[in-house]
Curated annotation (Swiss-Prot):
GO terms for biological process: ATP synthesis coupled electron transport; electron transport coupled proton transport. It catalyses: a plastoquinone + NADH + (n+1) H(+)(in) = a plastoquinol + NAD(+) + n H(+)(out); a plastoquinone + NADPH + (n+1) H(+)(in) = a plastoquinol + NADP(+) + n H(+)(out). Keywords: Membrane, NAD, NADP, Plastoquinone, Quinone, Thylakoid, Translocase, Transmembrane, Transmembrane helix. It is found in: Cellular thylakoid membrane. It comes from Synechococcus sp. (strain RCC307). Pfam families: Proton_antipo_M. GO terms for molecular function: NADH dehydrogenase (ubiquinone) activity; ubiquinone binding. NCBIfam families: NDH_I_M, PRK02546.1, PRK12561.1. The keyword Coiled coil does not apply. This is NAD(P)H-quinone oxidoreductase chain 4. It comes from the Bacteria. Belongs to the complex I subunit 4 family. Its main location: membrane.
Length: 544
């Protein structure tokens, strides 16, 4: 394999490409910097917000800040982002200590812009979902806003050291949100979360330092500078493996997933929405940004492993979800299963499958947030998460049943919903990916289809157990009021893009198509340079 050849140079050139329309660095409005710093600065000002004592003032303040942040990201997309440009846009670079490679560097392309919009959108709805929070509301919304800025920074920064800092910044709010407002086992879930994610994220720091100080030249943590370094095959493989572990925990990849069911099992509804809607997408984004883009030669070697791990995710998590009797854990394992399609798409050398993986992240962000919000709303009424203690509540909660049905159908990839389009793109894209042998493609698509079959079984049976049959005696005295306007509004806001993407996916896919095609094309020269191909890879494939 030609490690120091044209593939790596091409990757560096493409990562650093700034089209003429994108070179409006410091003379245009700093959209991304504002979107990052506004919620963080606003969170610090929460102690100054006047409040009568019931948290109402803080709630409106946090909602206003998150909505403003969302409008800023929309403004960035409409005024400074061109989806036909594959390179970085909305750039802002401010050197700080150039000799140490330290500075502020942000930008957006097709990999990051859709996820920045998703982050600000879900966070706004999470603030609305947190309206019933009365215990320490100032601290709760402080953490929620700080998390918003940190997550946007993960997708926007173009410096690996800044990426590590942003990655770590969002860990602290999640830990505290779990440890303070979680369920009975909140301390265990929060500790497990921080141990898994903090320890694994050390690999990000080690890789960043190793790459910045290797290969000669000035010290820099800029993505484009790191990609331009001439790295040996062994060094590339070590960096790739380390980052795969770090990002695999966040995605999560089986067997690095065990923190997620515990975290979801104890979290409140708004924290659920942020975990499922945004946090998991950070892992998929990072695999695209670093593993697939920065190490094209190593990615060729690891891609079959990603595909196999994706199938394991789909089948194992679907079977485990089928066996769960706890409602939160059932949906949590369903999330792990759906993220398996992201792994298959990233491991594929087909632009269609890779585009499907990107769409799956966006789709699952919306669907996962909606399902977990409904789980929280249902628990507030029934005060139980055990399916054995539910049943027959459909007569008293018809609006809630309608919302559950719509979101469950979206999760099982009903045609006309976003999940159907994204999973179909991954299936068809991988089936037509000439980089892999035909038997391997048949086995992978066939195995993944098992998960697709299991999903409607466990989701529809879940609906039956919650809403149909005889009402359980335990619920006879429960305050089973139907969905209130706030809850209907939140679910409607999530269902509109779910259905819109399902009916016309180009609304979203066009926003990242050029960048995804560029990422996949980077691996073509690496594949052609693979002088000793191994099954299931072919030599010099014709990319679909």
């Amino acid at each position: 394999m030609c490690v120091k050849g044209d593939a790596q140079l091409a990757a560096a050139a493409e990562i650093s490409t700034l089209q003429p329309d994108a070179a409006k660095e410091l003379d245009s409005f700093p959209w991304l910097t504002t979107a990052i710093l506004l919620p963080i600065a606003a969170s610090l000002a929460i102690p100054l917000v006047p409040d009568p004592g019931n948290g109402k003032g803080v709630r409106w303040y946090a909602l206003g800040v998150s909505l403003t942040t969302f409008l800023i990201t929309v403004g960035a997309y409409l005024n400074g982002y061109d989806p036909d440009i594959a390179g970085l846009q909305l750039r802002q670079v401010i050197p700080w200590v150039p000799d140490l490679g330290l500075g502020w560097s942000v930008g957006a392309d097709g990999l990051s812009m859709p996820l920045i919009l998703l982050t600000s959108f879900i966070t706004t709805l999470a603030c609305l979902a947190a309206w019933p929070v009365t215990f320490k509301p100032r601290l709760f919304f402080f953490l929620l806003l700080a998390m918003d800025g940190g997550q946007i920074a993960v997708f926007a920064v173009q410096d690996m050291l800044l990426f590590f800092l942003a990655w770590e910044l969002e860990l602290i709010p999640v830990y505290l949100l779990l440890a303070i407002w979680g369920g009975k086992k909140r301390q265990y879930a929060a500790t497990k979360f921080i141990l898994y994610t903090a320890v694994s994220s050390l690999f990000i720091l080690l890789v960043a330092l190793a790459m910045a100080f290797s290969g000669g030249g000035p010290v820099s943590f800029e993505y484009s500078d790191l990609a331009a370094k001439h790295l040996g095959a062994g060094f590339q493989a070590l960096c790739y493996a380390g980052l795969l572990i770090a990002f695999g925990v966040k995605l999560p990849i089986v067997p690095l997933h065990t923190w997620l069911p515990d975290a979801h099992g104890e979290a409140t509804a708004p924290v659920h929405m942020l975990l499922a809607g945004i946090l998991l997408k950070m892992g998929g984004y990072a695999l695209f940004r670093f593993n697939a883009s920065m190490f094209p030669d190593a990615h060729v070697q690891f891609a079959p492993l990603l595909v196999v791990l994706g199938v394991v995710n789909i089948i194992y998590a679907a079977l485990t979800s089928f066996a769960q009797r706890n409602l939160k854990r059932k949906i949590a394992y369903s999330s792990i299963s759906h993220m398996g399609f992201v792994l298959i798409g990233i491991g594929s050398f087909s632009p269609l499958a890779a585009s499907g993986a990107m769409l799956q992240m966006i789709s699952h962000g919306l669907i996962g947030a909606s399902l977990f919000f409904l789980v929280g709303a249902t628990y507030d009424r029934t005060h139980t998460l055990q399916l054995d203690e539910m049943g027959g509540v459909g007569q008293r909660m018809r609006k809630m049943f309608a919302m559950w049905t719509a979101c469950s159908l979206a999760s099982l990839a009903l045609p006309g919903m976003s999940g159907f389009v994204s999973e179909l793109m991954v299936f068809v894209g991988f089936a037509t990916d000439d980089a892999y042998t035909l038997p391997f493609r048949i086995v992978i698509d066939g195995a993944a289809a098992i998960g697709v079959i299991l999903t409607p079984i466990y989701l529809l049976s879940m609906l039956r157990e919650i809403f149909f049959g005889q009402e359980k005696p335990e619920l006879s005295d429960a305050n089973l009021v139907d969905a209130e306007p706030r809850e209907i509004y939140i679910i409607s806001c999530l269902l509109v893009p779910i259905i819109g993407i399902g009916l016309y996916p180009k609304l979203v896919t066009d926003s990242y198509r050029a960048t995804i095609e560029q990422v996949v094309a980077r691996d073509e020269s690496s594949m052609k340079a693979l002088t000793a191909p191994y099954l299931p890879l072919r030599s010099a494939p014709k990319l679909s």
